[in-house]
A protein has these predicted regions:
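Loop-to-helix entry and N-terminal half of a specific, functionally important transmembrane alpha helix
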Residues: 138-178, 184
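Membrane-proximal intracellular helices of multi-pass ion channels
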Residues: 123-126, 135-148, 212-219
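Lipid-exposed faces of alpha-helical membrane segments in multi-pass integral membrane proteins
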Residues: 9-17, 33-39, 120-131, 153, ...
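Structural signal for the C-terminal ends of transmembrane alpha-helices
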Residues: 16-25, 131-140, 201-208
Length: 219
């Protein structure tokens, strides 16, 4: 039985962003990361399970076991590269159609996008997610109270970390950790959390409008 390492890491980054929004000084963040780096030998020898160690080793050299533990990342990279600039066409990817890409509907959906939509489609996906993140931060800056700011920064941390980790998995920059691409991967609970987050962000924005109206009336 393998734990949900990706979710734990994402919650950790959400906490960091919310702590930053709360005004925690940067030196404490540096201290936390320094402590984590110093603890790496202890974590590796006494905390990490064997499958976790194997994922990290596979990320460094997936070609060492291309038919077993390194299969996912190798096939994901090949699919992304096969799309070139404009892609093979939506639903026309030969590797996707033959199920050569593992977990293509969720964890490796970006590899599917790379094959079928090409560099142009992948760039558009990234730009759309960046636009959402920008709008989230803008809403945070307009929030009328601290709670709204914390909500916005927490949602920003959720989407940003998920995006970075998923792209890192598909490009073999990070180990496979079962993280989906926000708003594009299939997944009931993941999608529900994301849309719930959108609703909370909208609530923060609407509350800002209500406060502006009340201020105008009081004047």
């Amino acid at each position: 039985m393998q734990g949900d390492d990706g979710a734990a890491i994402i919650f950790f980054f959400m906490f960091l962003f919310m702590a930053f929004a709360a005004g925690v000084q940067l030196r404490y963040f540096f201290a936390v990361f320094a402590a984590i780096i110093l603890m790496i030998p202890i974590l590796w020898n006494y905390v990490f399970a064997e499958y976790q160690k194997q994922r990290i080793i596979n990320q460094i050299n997936p070609e060492a076991d291309p038919l077993n533990t390194g299969f996912q990342q190798i096939q994901g990279k090949i699919s992304i590269g096969s799309g070139k600039i404009f892609g093979q066409g939506l639903f026309n990817g030969p590797r996707v159609g033959s199920n050569s890409v593992p977990i293509q509907e969720s964890d490796f959906i970006f590899s599917v996008a790379g094959e079928e939509l090409g560099f142009i489609g992948c760039t558009l996906i990234i730009l759309l997610l960046c636009l959402m993140l920008f709008r989230t931060l803008k809403t945070a800056s307009m929030s009328s109270d601290c709670l709204g700011t914390y909500i916005c920064f927490g949602f920003f941390g959720l989407v940003a970390s998920q995006t970075i980790f998923n792209l890192g998995m598909c490009l073999s920059v990070l180990p496979v950790m079962g993280v989906t691409l926000p708003f594009f991967s299939a997944g009931g609970s993941s999608s529900a959390c994301l849309y719930l987050g959108i609703g909370l962000i909208q609530s923060v924005y609407i509350q800002r409008d209500d406060d502006d109206i009340n201020a105008i009336i009081s004047e």
